[in-house]
């Protein structure tokens, strides 16, 4: 008998305003399924990010079918899973965990497929020869993997933690071939951006708790496209500034919707309507929260 009820959740920090519960529960309702989606906020629980393994085990023992994982646990969770799919392994980041009938936890990454689908839909003609990416965390790893999968020539990764940028560039080169990725520092951004085709922004800057621009506005120029990972608000200060200069832009709503749709498929085994889920996100565009 096909299962028709599901208990899932989201582990992360500061996730109170997350749209994930509404997205998954609403799509389940429309498909005649029952989905209960719980928020497991490490800040409210008073536990550190390193407790993610304990939380995953507790969710499994309590009968959860699966979990989404968001900042700052996407990389920390790896050590606590029984198995990774090839994409999660290549990325070194997990945003979806599925518990099988035997209680084994398998990690997936729907951020990369979500970003790729959104980019192909929203910036289909964008030149991809040279890309600068800001941010090398879990969402950044997925975005870089996605644009290289879409055919980007080279991605230069910039992160406040230089060693994290270097580590991501190394993993990307190992997966896609030498020379496809590089890493740089913020003080080298002027040179990197002067010859770039586009910017992928994958840091928390622009969210409610982290307002502002992730780079000096003077470094933007009309020849760039700008793709955002932050989805609440859909119109970040970066996108507004870039659009005013004449840049082509892509908000983070598509990545959020398409990654959620891919996670829904993993949780339920049913085919979601991703465009309908994107409309749900667009309809809730007024609030502010983190990329998931």
Predicted regions and their residues:
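NAD(P)-binding Rossmann-fold cofactor-contacting core
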Residues: 152-176
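N-terminal Rossmann-fold NAD(P) dinucleotide-binding loop
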Residues: 140-141, 235
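Phosphate/diphosphate ligand-binding glycine-rich loop within oxidoreductases
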Residues: 2-124
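Adenosine-phosphate binding glycine-rich loop
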Residues: 225, 229-292
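Rossmann-like adenosine-cofactor binding region
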Residues: 179-250
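Glycine-rich Rossmann-fold phosphate-binding loop(s) that bind the pyrophosphate
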Residues: 13, 136-137
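Conserved S-adenosyl-L-methionine
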Residues: 149-154, 245-247
């Amino acid at each position: 008998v096909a299962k028709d009820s599901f208990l899932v959740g989201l582990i992360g920090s500061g996730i109170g305003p997350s749209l994930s519960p509404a997205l998954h529960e609403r799509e389940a309702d429309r498909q005649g399924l029952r989905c209960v989606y719980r928020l497991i906020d490490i800040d409210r629980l008073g536990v550190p990010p390193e407790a993610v393994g304990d939380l995953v085990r507790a969710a499994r023992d309590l009968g959860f079918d699966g979990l989404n994982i968001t900042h700052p646990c996407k990389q920390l969770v790896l050590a606590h899973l029984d198995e990774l799919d090839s994409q999660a392994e290549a990325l070194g980041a997990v945003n979806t965990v599925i518990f099988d009938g035997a209680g084994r936890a398998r990690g997936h990454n729907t951020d990369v497929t979500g970003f790729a689908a959104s980019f192909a839909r929203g910036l289909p003609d964008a030149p991809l020869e040279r890309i600068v990416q800001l941010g090398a965390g879990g969402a950044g790893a997925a975005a870089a993997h996605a644009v290289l999968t879409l055919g980007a020539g080279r991605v230069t990764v910039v992160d406040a933690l230089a060693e994290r940028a270097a580590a991501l560039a190394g993993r990307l080169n190992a997966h896609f071939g030498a020379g496809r990725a590089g890493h740089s520092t913020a003080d080298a951004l002027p040179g990197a951006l002067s010859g770039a085709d586009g910017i992928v922004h994958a840091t928390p800057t622009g969210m409610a708790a982290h307002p502002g621009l992730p780079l000096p506005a003077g470094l933007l120029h009309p020849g760039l496209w700008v793709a955002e990972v932050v989805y609440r608000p859909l119109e970040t200060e970066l996108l507004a500034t870039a659009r005013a200069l004449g840049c082509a832009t892509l908000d983070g709503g598509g990545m959020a919707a398409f990654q959620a749709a891919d996670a829904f498929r993993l949780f339920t085994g049913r085919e979601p309507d991703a465009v309908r889920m994107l409309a749900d996100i667009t309809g809730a565009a007024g609030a502010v929260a983190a990329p998931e």
